[in-house]
From Swiss-Prot:
Keyword Cell membrane: yes
The protein's annotated pathway: Cell wall biogenesis; peptidoglycan biosynthesis
Protein's organism: Corynebacterium jeikeium (strain K411)
Localization, UniProt: Cell membrane
EC number: 2.7.8.13
Protein name: Phospho-N-acetylmuramoyl-pentapeptide-transferase
Amino acid sequence: MLQIFIAGAVAFLVSVFLTPVLIRWFSAEGLGQEIREEGPKSHFKKRGTPTMGGIAVLAGIVFGYLIAVLVGLVTTGAGPGVSGWLVLGLTLALGGLGFADDYIKLVKGRNLGLNAKAKLVGQLVTAIVFGLLILQFPNAHGLTPGSTHLSFVRDIATFDIAIGPAIVGMILFLIFIYLVISAWSNAVNLTDGLDGLASGVTAIVMGTYVLITFWQFRNSCAVSAQAACYAVRDPLDLSMLASAGLGACLGFLWWNAAPAKIFMGDTGSLALGGLVAGLSVTTQTELLMILVGIIFVIEAASVVIQVVSFKATGKRVFRMAPIHHHFENKGWAETTVVIRFWLLAALAAMSGFAVFYAEWLNGASF
């Protein structure tokens, strides 16, 4: 419990104190966000706001997790688990991809960045490496960081993604991992369009996963082989990472809340999407994450619906996509949209945890 708290506290402090340093530096260098001409008119005043604040978020996550690991080594002698390293590596890899995208935007002075092909290749390579590694490193109980089964609250034993011959099964599994990583990283990226929206929603999701992973740690099959135990590798490390993500997002939100002094950029949004994806896979809650992170799902779905509708019928379903811009164009104030989306995110997160806990109660009663 101490390590989980320390991870969040350190991440918050690093993020909240590093972010203003970045604001001053980027402002002095004239490195500010460009705003799309086709975007909401109210956003034009944000032109020039420093971006790449995701650097502070990433720094918070890294230092928060590493300090918590160090505390564990000193107090209990327990070293870090491989699951934590793999999810952290995924987060940093996507953060690096986002950094490259942000850097190109700032150098060119246009709201463009890496082309779609470059992003696709970057996410694909990252997903393949992550997918291959999570099936390695079995612990003393034979548990690996990931499995080839689709999961809801835990693995669904009857739904193995890697069906067929070994090579075919592995290809299917890697495609699935790519879709999970690409979907969540792009969904968080699309949500990052209003002051405090993505950082606030991600904080809510991370807070929920602190509870989920802590409960998995307390009821791990490695500790007590009870009926409802969780066959998750390194749940304490995953809880520390979720806590670090929560703390880093809250520290950044202090400066990113309306009116935002800095944006996280793709550096932050792609990294946080990677953290969400990594936690969903390693905690065996891939389908549950859809409920917990429903705001991200709605934001991404609104873009897909808009594009498909326009190409098929020539008509738009929404005034503008992602959907948060639709409500802005209907006359909602930006802060109203953000707060209402936070409320919906909190309700979804509570519902998700309720489903998770109810499943445990049902299993523990037998």
